[in-house]
């Protein structure tokens, strides 16, 4: 981005709807950024655009102005039903979709346009009811929208006049391109439909998508001297893994009160780093895939209001978040992808402001540094890790932000957030029948809290299954010895009393030469067994030593042959 973020081109110089111009002026937008000044002359007459610009340069406002102006000055298609949407804006992440919807409502609330926000992780039926009532503009992530289009036939895109693909390169990274193509084929042909595509990088695959589904798009590129924003001061430290948390605390203590984002590579480290910061008195929010969507929105809103000092996030929040006033971005872990580095540090120094991007190159992730420096075409200045930086400064008492007391509660602690997230995830799996330990269909019988399993003992412990008897086979010796009545009844149909007797716990009695061992307890059945008509004596089992089978007289053993051979050799000498 150039040092001059605004151009001399004004919004009033375009042929915009008067109500739209009034809304822009009331929101404080009078002059265009470079990407807006390039996009609007092409998009307002109805041309397709493939635009490339860095994050934070005003791409969102550029396509929102084009969409709203078209819907205000042009009539809908003749075959459109009142509930069919006229415009579709697709974003790769929930956070970006939420931000676009917030900006759209801000500018279009007084224009009579109806907006719908569609994304996963929230109430399905409520979104479906909103779509069935009819909207003008749908702002969505691809997955949830396809569910409404394909499975439930809630939305029809046959009358969609204009489609916007924001962060198209991120769509590829997240595997949404098949979904995008599916949705584009449900819209009017590209000669009738206007398509606006925006991306931080116009790679070969992005341009291939543009030329396949767009009508001779005009490629617009905002020229920049470097890949990263010019007003971002970058520096990098080389700490060990053990020094990273201490170094982070030391640097944070030297920038008290500044709005800060900390990026890590894994969801597990989001919780670990956030807990450490919270223990040292910082008010921390977290954004990761483990945090429920509603809680993410609440934490993001509090961070934007200044009620949270630090936001710890994975790359799910690296793109599309329009948060004003972020002064510091920490790469606690260097990202694997160089493009993710650019988008992370793009959270600061937006629209001409200044900011700092501080990265830690530990032994685990330092291998990513050469690729990052090659991608941004510059060397990142290296700062030494000194003992002074590893010593956090004492923190000054923090002044609460207005409205903080009403929103602050114990439920927003990091530990509580992740514990509730795990409990919610476990409850959802239980409702879907996904857990092994559930009472329904459980084999182990543990965790479900149900009754005793069939075939278990009175103490609840499992007993081994009996092998089925073969016709004519003699009863097992143990059964005959221990309880003649049970052994006699084994060949007949089992009755309830016999089955209960078999399940009753009992101590096995050893016998020597047919006599019980002295002191052994007799077996006690849980259910009385009827007396036999003719009692039999217990079978005696006598162990006898096993003798080797006699060898035939005609074939001497191996030892005999060896001995005979040795004697012949000795006598021969």
UniProtKB/Swiss-Prot annotation:
| Gene that specifies this protein | rhlB
What does the annotation say about its assembly with partners? Component of the RNA degradosome, which is a multiprotein complex involved in RNA processing and mRNA degradation.
Q: Which InterPro entries match?
A: DEAD/DEAH_box_helicase_dom, DEAD_box_RNA_helicase, Helicase_ATP-bd, Helicase_C-like, P-loop_NTPase, RhlB, RNA-helicase_DEAD-box_CS, RNA_helicase_ATP-dep_RhlB
Protein function: DEAD-box RNA helicase involved in RNA degradation. Has RNA-dependent ATPase activity and unwinds double-stranded RNA.
Q: Which UniProt keywords apply?
A: ATP-binding, Cytoplasm, Helicase, Hydrolase, Nucleotide-binding, RNA-binding
Residue numbers covered by motif Q motif: 9-37
Q: Which GO terms describe its molecular function?
A: ATP binding; ATP hydrolysis activity; RNA binding; RNA helicase activity
Domain (Helicase C-terminal) ranges: 231-393
Keyword Signal belongs to the record: no
UniProt-listed Enzyme Commission number(s): 3.6.4.13
Cite the record's Basic and acidic residues compositional bias ranges: 419-432, 451-462
Question: Where are the compositionally biased (Acidic residues) regions?
Answer: 402-411
Q: Name one Pfam family in it.
A: DEAD
Q: Please list the GO biological process terms of this entry.
A: RNA catabolic process
Gene Ontology terms, cellular component aspect? cytosol
Location within or outside the cell: Cytoplasm
The reaction(s) catalysed by this protein are: ATP + H2O = ADP + phosphate + H(+)
List the protein's name.
ATP-dependent RNA helicase RhlB
Biased composition regions of type Low complexity, renumbered to the chain: 484-499, 541-560
Q: What HAMAP family does its record include? A: DEAD_helicase_RhlB (MF_00661)
Gly residues composition-biased segments: 435-450
Q: Does the keyword RNA-binding apply?
A: yes
Pinpoint motif DEAD box by residue range.
166-169
- Which family is this protein grouped under? Belongs to the DEAD box helicase family. RhlB subfamily.
